[in-house]
């Protein structure tokens, strides 16, 4: 336990929780402190000036990160016939209709992202209580209810990241791995921030992007000057 506390203290050295730093410096600090024995995920958290309890202040969307996420994303597709074949050919790991609904209702969810053709939604709607809390419910607004299942599968595996503001007005997402080059992380972060800004709801008043921070899975958060992300 003493060794763990010492390691945590060492990782946190040089990180001032009250100081805002430029994006490039923040990336360097986070990468230097990603010392776990696995390839840590680099995560971004954005505090927004919205209250998602109001429908006109909800923020959600999807962004294709230019350099991918570094994750091996397992995709499930609810489809029948030719569209099911199309999904398999595109690389979807799990494809089905009524049979897949039964599997998910039984508690087996061995996928990270879920796609459905429009005709399947009355069936998939039964899974709202299971998929909804996990942020996996297919939604046409983020391109996961579509007839272009091949395109959706490829996007999911190629770096598509969904985002949705939480109750406290925070959006967070994984935007790469510690092994990524600094420039690749910077490009991903700016692409993510740009998508969040473009998704600004009509009901948002005042300062929209209030705070931004990045961190690795096991490392401390580093606060970023919002202007270096949103410029």
Swiss-Prot record:
Which example biological process does GO assign this protein? regulation of translation
Q: Which domain of life is it from?
A: Bacteria
Q: Which SUPFAM superfamilies match?
A: Ribosomal protein L1
GO MF annotations for this entry? rRNA binding; structural constituent of ribosome; tRNA binding
Going by the UniProt record, its keywords in alphabetical order are: Repressor, Ribonucleoprotein, Ribosomal protein, RNA-binding, rRNA-binding, Translation regulation, tRNA-binding
Under Gene3D superfamilies, the record lists: 3.30.190.20, 3.40.50.790
Listed GO CC annotations: cytosolic large ribosomal subunit
Q: What InterPro entries has UniProt attached to this entry?
A: Ribosom_uL1_bac-type, Ribosomal_uL1, Ribosomal_uL1-like, Ribosomal_uL1/biogenesis, Ribosomal_uL1_3-a/b-sand, Ribosomal_uL1_CS
Metal-binding is among the record's keywords: no
What's the stated role of this polypeptide? Binds directly to 23S rRNA. The L1 stalk is quite mobile in the ribosome, and is involved in E site tRNA release.
How does this polypeptide assemble, per the annotation?
Answer: Part of the 50S ribosomal subunit.
Q: Which family does it belong to?
A: Belongs to the universal ribosomal protein uL1 family.
List the protein's name: Large ribosomal subunit protein uL1
Q: Which organism is it from?
A: Allorhizobium ampelinum (strain ATCC BAA-846 / DSM 112012 / S4)
